[in-house]
Amino acid sequence: MKKRTIPVLLLGLACHAGMAQKPQRDTLSLTSKIHQIDEVVVTGARHETDVRHLSQTVSVVGRAQIESALQPSLLPVLTEQVPGLFVTSRGIMGYGVSTGAAGGISLRGLSGGTARLMVMIDGHPQYAGIFGHPIADAYQSFLAERVEVLRGPASVLYGSNAMGGVINIVTRKMQEDGVDTHLHAGYGSYNTLETELTNRVRKGRFSSVVSGSYNRTDGHRTDMGFEQYGGYAKLGYEVAEHWNLHGDVNVTHFNASYPGPITAPLLDGDHMMGVSLYQSSRFFKGNRITFGFDWFRYGGHAWNEYVSGENAGTSADLVDKQEDELAGYVDLRQDIRSWLTFNAGLRVDHHSRVGTEWVPQVGLAFHLPQTMELKASASKGFRYPILREMYMFPPQNPDLQPESMWNYELAFSQQLMNGKLQYGVNLFFIDGKNLIQTSPNPNGSGMLNQNSGEIENAGVEVQAAYRIDRHWSVDGNYSYLHMKNPVIAAPEHKLYAGTSFSRGRWNVSTGLQYIAGLYTQTDPVVTEDFVLWNLRATFRVNRWLDIWACGENLLAQKYEINAGYPMPRATVMTGINLNF
């Protein structure tokens, strides 16, 4: 058995001009139909924008979907609801880090584990300074009011790690004066316990959100236990009509166990800090232009401590470095006609060791009759080599260059029946070069990290939702991914179909997820196909008490996502929600 204890501390402080005012949403004169509020997003524009004006696709998972999923982690919810997105798992709860870990997030075949996908909380990047990957166990459901997923490169606005896309967790807040407290608790299979307590306050210009959680499980295998506790706090104050000041802290501590030999532990203390300034303005009718400046410093110190053998009690440095990134960008949106919006952006990004990268993007959004939308875009994504690739372990190479790719995309969507029926289709092609991979050293013996990889992915994504009546609704999504060079944890086919029922005191939802062509190994090739059936139900006893239950993998499918780590068969959880 091997256990890792990982504390994660994320701090944020921001001062916003214009954020305290009532949002001024963009409107179109083409149609008088009312569009849903979840079409207003902040990801992909740095300000509140009607998603119809953007030439890129942003998927939104709202608070209602998050709560009905009854999951302590956001990532399984995103796997169901967002086409093209997949998250690896190894057990009933928890992801861990390092050897045997899961929580790898991939979007269209590009993975956050290789720093090609960015996760943000309220627009602040969240990734390890040395290893460059997101910390999957830090993204818990109690944080989110909604999650916005930009499917495709977002490097113009967000820089290096947004090469494949962005997941932005928008945190909760009170809209009106008052106090709201919510307790969620449940117990189930394999001695699994999940708890969460959230308090939200708004009084005049002051607002706060304070949350805490404790989760643990014995796991479905010997030495697969997991324990996690953490908290989140956010304080805000409206200084003036157009000025908001807020600060937040997110602390997560988890103990992750997994089978394996005892080896010398790897310890590290990494950091990531920075400043992001931007100003969004309108100069004339139909115009919006954003100027921005970013500075980030990341790095850290990692070392091995020997616990046995002739070197017992000593340590050896692996890396002690830091790097800086400095960037400026401009993002332009212009309504050319009532039926056409033009988008363009350019970023100039300088890395203290690697050099300067120019990052353009361009797109068109056509607003057609019958609430149809057609979007076309071409955007560049890039990422700098991370410290691990340049300086750690025998394959390291300090002369690595940035990876880069182009994403070409065509998207069509429509709302029918006064918005009760919505559907969309995306076609995309990704062409990338200089991908970092470990290959035989051309100038000597052994292996070396090199810019020798290529990526050529193409696919189609479909999603639809239909509100049948005030009691019934159905939704689904499908994605097909063709990879010239297959990678692990990016399924060829991913399908989800779900339905929900709400009447009186009852809320019931169920869904089927089909995964096919999931590579768990590439040499030799091993793929997995499986079908998962989940069922969730909530009964409202009174205004302050709900009783809930959920079952996962009710077909008791035998499958693996991480090679060598079989997933649990059918599991059941039940619990209560208190609202006061």
Task: Tell where the protein language model's regions lie, with residue ranges.
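Conserved C-terminal beta-signal and adjacent last beta-strands/turns
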Residues: P7, A20, G236-V239, A376, ...
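Short acidic/polar hinge/loop motifs at secondary-structure boundaries
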Residues: H124-R151
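Short, acidic, small-residue-rich periplasmic hinge/interaction motif at the N-terminus
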Residues: K22-E67, L75
